Structure formats: C-alpha cells, structure tokens
Amino acid sequence: MIPTDTAPPSKPAQGHKGYKNRRRLSRELALQGIYQWRLAGGNAQEIDLQLQQVNFYSKADGSYFSDLLQGVLEHSRDLEAQIQAYLDRQLAELSPVECSILLIGTYEMVHHPEIPCRAIINEAIELAKSYGGTDGHKYVNGVLDKLAAQLRAVELQSSPVRNKDPH
C-alpha cells in the first residue's frame, strides 16, 4: 500500500460531485493497489478485497476501480512496453507512484475509448500532483501527451485547439 503519509484522503475531495468524484476515488484506489502490487506483488483479487476495506471505498465506483486494477495487472507487460517507448530512462527507474499513474492512464487510453484522452491525462496529472514527486506531474503529462498522440491521434485531430487566437 501507499505509505500513510501519502495515502488518499479518507473523505472525497471537495469541489467535484457525483460521477467524476466517484471515478477519481476509483483511480486513487487503483493507484494504491498498483503501487502495492509493484512493490510487494500479490494478485488482483487479494488486493481488490483488501482495498474494499478502505473507508472511502463505498464512495468510489467499485466496478471501475476493479476494472482499472485488474486490467492494469493483466495487461501490465503490454502497457509497460507502450510507456517505455516514450521514456527518457528505464521504467524501473521511475518512482513506483509515477509508474503506477502512467500504467493507469495508458490502460484508460487503450481500454476506455469512451473517456476523452484529455480527461484521462488531467486525472493522471491530478494523481501525480497529490501523490507523486515535486515535478512528477510534468513528467506524467509529457509521457501521456506523447502516448495520446499515438493512441488517440484521430481524437486529438478532431478536438479544437485551446488558447489559439483565430486572428
């Protein structure tokens, strides 16, 4: 598990309501589980059952959490290969937190096309800001942006460019 000094809050974050908040909590739980798996091993079912005991589990989207945890663990080799292509170092040299966040974001891009890639990247950045190193969110953003250009090229081409002056 993530050490208690970096564990997710026991209450949902304020400012987000309903569905989005439930998904964010699901990602936080998945981050804990994947972090634990990367450091100590174990199987998805055991980790899933253990994290169901976390006091804010009932506020999360349990099925989405299970999908993220089990999906990342099941497809970890493929996800790691996709991520490695965009890293400036070996995956093993990344912090376990940032590596886990990249695995979640990559899994969502590949297996959840219904979620806009910008939302996936933004959620990963928020996780990295909360649980990663000082500039970890910048690194996560850079890697996922490059992955999105490959995995979601059509989506990115069809979305309007923000902050562009039409004149």
Swiss-Prot record:
Tell me the keywords, alphabetical order.
RNA-binding, Transcription, Transcription antitermination, Transcription regulation
Q: Does the keyword 4Fe-4S apply?
A: no
**Which terms does the record give in the GO molecular function aspect?**
RNA binding
> Which parts of the sequence are annotated with region: Disordered?
1-21
Taxonomically, which superkingdom?
Bacteria
Q: Which cysteines are joined by disulfide bonds?
A: none
GO BP term (any one): transcription antitermination
Coiled coil residues, start to end: none
Q: Record's Gene Ontology CC terms?
A: cytosol
Q: Which PANTHER family match?
A: ANTITERMINATION NUSB DOMAIN-CONTAINING PROTEIN, N UTILIZATION SUBSTANCE PROTEIN B-RELATED
Q: Which family does it belong to?
A: Belongs to the NusB family.
Please explain the role this protein plays, according to its UniProt record. Answer: Involved in transcription antitermination. Required for transcription of ribosomal RNA (rRNA) genes. Binds specifically to the boxA antiterminator sequence of the ribosomal RNA (rrn) operons.
HAMAP family registered for this protein in UniProt:
NusB (MF_00073)
Name of the molecule in the record: Transcription antitermination protein NusB
Instruction: Name the source organism.
Output: Nitrosomonas eutropha (strain DSM 101675 / C91 / Nm57)
What gene does this protein come from?
nusB
